[in-house]
Amino acid sequence: MRIGILGGTFDPIHYGHIRPAIEVKHALALDKILLMPNHIPPHKQQPNLTTAQRLKMVADVCSQLDGFELCDIEAKRDTPSYTVVTLEQLKSLHPEDELFFIMGMDSFIQLKSWYEWQRLFDFAHLVVCQRPGWQLDAAHPMQQILTARSHAHQETHEGHAKNTHKNSGQIFPVTITPQDISSTQIREQLAKGEIPVDLLMPVTLDYIQNQQLYLP
């Protein structure tokens, strides 16, 4: 099975998370996508909602989307959500499956600052989402890694038959439709009493309104 993994604070989860995940799922013929809320994001301030509230919102979204499932292993952890620890745990749960960890190009270019980043490739492929026409500068230090581990590059140099059995360690660049949406923007709108109906799935908006979340 080919399993995509999209982690995030999801505070709240919105179409800027969901639409790229759907596009990646189709582009790489993934069997399912795991949406994985963080508990203690190492690179972010603490979230506005409780872990339980964010889990509920993501679970609601997954119930509306075919092939999407909530993954709560980071949310249940009491230590920081380092990706390499999570992927190692997921790989132990899915030893025969291919894992595809989804990130934006903005995260990829910072990858060397991640905890034990080289070991990510031991457990999963990386999917790097990029805007149409955008390319990493040839002189950027991450370009060499992107080129060497590119799925297309390895198929060209190793041959398709050999490559199909590689179930981790590759990078799959995927061009996605730009989504000019941020959780900060949504929280600010809600705090002002505005209803961002175009940015949130109805099930998410219903939960936020019923629970009176993000009010000033």
Curated annotation (Swiss-Prot):
<keyword id="KW-0662">Pyridine nucleotide biosynthesis</keyword>
<keyword id="KW-0067">ATP-binding</keyword>
<keyword id="KW-0808">Transferase</keyword>
<dbReference type="GO" id="GO:0005524">
    <property type="term" value="F:ATP binding"/>
</dbReference>
<protein>
    <recommendedName>
        <fullName>Probable nicotinate-nucleotide adenylyltransferase</fullName>
        <ecNumber>2.7.7.18</ecNumber>
    </recommendedName>
</protein>
<keyword id="KW-0520">NAD</keyword>
<keyword id="KW-0548">Nucleotidyltransferase</keyword>
<comment type="pathway">
    <text>Cofactor biosynthesis; NAD(+) biosynthesis; deamido-NAD(+) from nicotinate D-ribonucleotide: step 1/1.</text>
</comment>
<dbReference type="Pfam" id="PF01467">
    <property type="entry name" value="CTP_transf_like"/>
</dbReference>
<dbReference type="InterPro" id="IPR014729">
    <property type="entry name" value="Rossmann-like_a/b/a_fold"/>
</dbReference>
<dbReference type="GO" id="GO:0004515">
    <property type="term" value="F:nicotinate-nucleotide adenylyltransferase activity"/>
</dbReference>
<keyword id="KW-0547">Nucleotide-binding</keyword>
<dbReference type="GO" id="GO:0009435">
    <property type="term" value="P:NAD biosynthetic process"/>
</dbReference>
<dbReference type="InterPro" id="IPR005248">
    <property type="entry name" value="NadD/NMNAT"/>
</dbReference>
<dbReference type="InterPro" id="IPR004821">
    <property type="entry name" value="Cyt_trans-like"/>
</dbReference>
<comment type="similarity">
    <text>Belongs to the NadD family.</text>
</comment>
<comment type="function">
    <text>Catalyzes the reversible adenylation of nicotinate mononucleotide (NaMN) to nicotinic acid adenine dinucleotide (NaAD).</text>
</comment>
